[in-house]
Structure formats: structure tokens, C-alpha cells
Amino acid sequence: MEEFQGHIELDRSWQHNFFYPLIFQEYIYAFAYDHGLNKSILLENSGDKKYSLLIVKRLITRMSQQNHLILSANDSNQNEIFGHKNKKKLYSEMITEGFAVIVEIPFSLLLISSLEGKEIVKSHNLRSIHSIFPFLEDKFLHLNYVLDILIPYPAHLEILVQTLRYWLKDASSLHFLRFFLYEYRNWNSLITQKEFISFLKKRNQRLFLFLYNFHVCEYESLFVFLRNQSSYLRSTSFGALLERIHFYGKIKYLVKVFTNDLGVIQWFFKEPFPHYVRYQGKSILASKGTFFLMHKWKYYIIYFWQCNFSVWSQPRKIYINRLSNHSLDFMGFFSSVRLNSSVIRSQLLENSFLIENIIKKFDTIVPIIPLVGSLAKAKFCNVLGHPVSKSVWADLSDSDIIDRFGRICRNLSHYYSGSSRKKSLYRIKYILRLSCARTLSRKHKSTVRSFLKRLGSEFLEEFFTEEEKVLSLILPRDSSTSWGLYKRRIWYLDIICIHKLVNDE
């Protein structure tokens, strides 16, 4: 983000949030090439990684003309331009990639300024998704019910633009965005969740991910405030509070009402405070309250989506579960609150007593069946979990094959290091090790047994994490201390995303 600040002049148009002129700047496309998710669009050919300034100059020249967005049929049928057969598709992808970089600028600057104001130096630690689990472990032991929520996708692309317009006041940029969204889909039709996911995978991922993430963050900014002020919204019609334009003025009015109503303040302390956590399109809302209270929260959220974002969600997308007897499928773990009972014998003179203590423990379990399904889909094993050779990797060198398998195994071990039961993880490691051995033996046309015998223990070391290597050198395998360290849960602050095998849907 510091690179942007060095290139962008803070002139009058920038101060008034006019971002449209930036689409004509060459350095924007250079940043899009460096940071974009689809880097191939700015390459002169598929085998060359050199950034093509010539393509960008042609694009900017064409956009500066009166008919910059009109491409004739002959343009699409011309010869290849730097490896791309369709010039219209190439230009569209380049513009949307650059536009995605532009709309990210103000929000990145807001993030940097907020972190500097709070004197937070190592902000990357706050991005670790593993930091959620210590929070759940600390809070969930004292809670009763949880709402398992699937955040609905917007039913129309115009909703995304309408949400963005309250922050981005440049009308030209919004019209520009509408134009390209119209190119992707008929503007007058609705979209389903499956079609929206298809957009994210097949189209400009950076732009659509930004629009969806901004849509979710805007929903959360309103919902979290209303959740915090839920004590005095019971006697107030919340439908009138959700108009976004005058929302901040209504916040001041609500605070004034709150300070003047002592009866409502007394009721506030009786209301169990819910805890809210989200990752991607799934969120959870947990509370110490009763089932009736969670039922009210469920329909409150549904009406909240309808009134404020024109999103109609079915009640079956929100589940009410009791933490004591349900596992929560969240971020690749099965999490639950388990009751451990311990019986203590107490002797008092001639009488003895049995005292049963119940201790709550937060369990995080590796979901073995979904993981095996993901491995089967990736052709590492069959549907029953029996390892098979990865035939598409058989043409690689031995070191590349071992490195690829070992990297997947280490990444999964790293992510699931916080699991309270690691036996399932050992099975996943076994599948990957044997699949690697089968791939190598297939390449060299030998048996798996003879190949493993020839490689020896050096082959298995590639599948160990750094922590396991250190422990194996310091402590013997059969010691109780070593076994206790292997079983201990460890949460890391350097994990910012879920492995694709964990998050495969």
C-alpha cells in the first residue's frame, strides 16, 4: 500500500473520492499485474513473465477515444494479440483488474490509518485465522446455544453496487462498474448462489471477491452495532433504523434515548451478550441465553437481511444447536464442548463418599470423512481412502514429486496442529505418504515395497513438520514427555487462509 501512496498525488479529485481518472494511469495496471489474482492477462505470451507496457498503452489510448468501449466484430476475429485470441476479452479483463486495484485503495488507506492510530505494529498477527480458536476455547465453555449461519449471496448484482455507493461517491466509477457487471451477466436477471460462486472462480476473481467481501463487511458493521445496542431496540421499530444514508444521525439519537431510560438500562444487564465470529460466508452467533432467545435472534437476522440488503434468506440456512450435544463445522474443524466427568472418592472417618465433578472441555477434531473426500477428488486416494498414484505428476522429477507431497502434508499438519485428537491426521499423512510412494514406483516401474526399502528413512523425513523434526531429535519417541508434546494443541499466528483441500466444496 505504501507503493500506491508514492505514486498517487493527493490532489483535489483524490480528496473528493474521484477514482475514475486513475483508470487512465499506467502504474495502476502495473500494480494489478504484481498483485492480481489472474496475472496472465498482462503477459505478452503464456511463457513470458515480462509485463507488457505496450498492451496498456493501447488500452489507455482506446479508452481515451469517444468509442473506447465499443469493439466491433472484427476486433474479436482478428489474429492473436500477445497470445490472446479475443481482444475484447483481453481488454475487459485488464480494465476490471485495474479497477479492482483502484477501489481497494481507499479501504487499504483506512486500514493503515486505523492501525497507526491504535499503535498496532504487527498487524499480520491479527489476520491469523488460528487466533479465532483460542477465543472460542475461552468463551464457548460458558455458553449454551449457537446459531450456525450461512450468509446469503446477493440476489442481484445491483445490490453490490448500491452497497458500494455509500462509500465510493464517484458516480463515474460506479457507472463504469455497472457496465462491466452487465458484460458478465444480463443485468435484469437474478443470480443464484451457485452462479455467484461460478463468477468468483471463472471471472475476475479480485473484483468479485472485493465486492462480496465489502457487502459482507457492510452487513457486519450494521449488525454488530445493532447487536451491541439490542437492549433498547426491543421497544423501537428497527425497520426505520436501517436506512443507510441517515444511519449515523440515528446512532446519536439512540445513544441519547439509552442514557435517558433507566428502566431499559436495568433490562440491558439481564440480556445475555452474544458472541459473533465469521470466516468467509459462514458465521456463528453464540449466547448463554435460552432456546427462545436464540430463536428470536434467528428471525431478527433474517428480517435484518431483508430490510437492509434486499436479501431473502430461508430459515433453514440458520441452525440453532446446543453446544453440549452438537459439533460445529467451522473453518475445517469439528468443534464442540465436551463434558468430562471425574469421580473422586472422599473418606470421612468410617464413611466414604463419591463426588462426581463435571469439567467442560473445548474439543477441535479433524473431520476425517470430508478430508478423505477432498483427497479422493484430488486423485490421491479412492473414495474409500485407499492411496493411489498421482498419475499427472509421474512425469516430474523425483525431488519435485516428493517435495509436492511433503509440502501438502506439512501444510495440513501445520493447520491441524490445534486438533485435540490427532489420530485422524495420522491417517491423512499415511494416505499422502503411500500415494507419493505409489507415484514414484509407477514412474520407475517397480513395487512400492522395494522403492521404500531403497529410500529408507530419508523419504519419510520430507513429510515431517519442523516441530516434529526438532522433537524427534531432542526426545525419544517412546518417552511420555515426547508423546505429550505431540498431543498438545498448538495455534499459530501465521495462517491467513485455509488449505484448498480443507476448504474444498
Curated annotation (Swiss-Prot):
Keyword annotations from UniProtKB, A to Z: Chloroplast, mRNA processing, Plastid, RNA-binding, tRNA processing
A single GO cellular-component term from the record reads:
chloroplast
The terms under GO molecular function for this entry are: RNA binding
Would you say which domain of life the source belongs to? Eukaryota
GO biological process entries? mRNA processing; RNA splicing; tRNA processing
Q: Where is the protein found, in the record's own terms?
A: Plastid, Chloroplast
For this protein, the record's Pfam families field holds:
Intron_maturas2, MatK_N
Say where the protein is mainly found: plastid
Similarity field: Belongs to the intron maturase 2 family. MatK subfamily.
The job of this chain, per UniProt, is described as: Usually encoded in the trnK tRNA gene intron. Probably assists in splicing its own and other chloroplast group II introns.
Quote the HAMAP family the UniProt record gives.
Answer: MatK
Give the protein's recorded name: Maturase K
Source organism of this protein record: Beta vulgaris
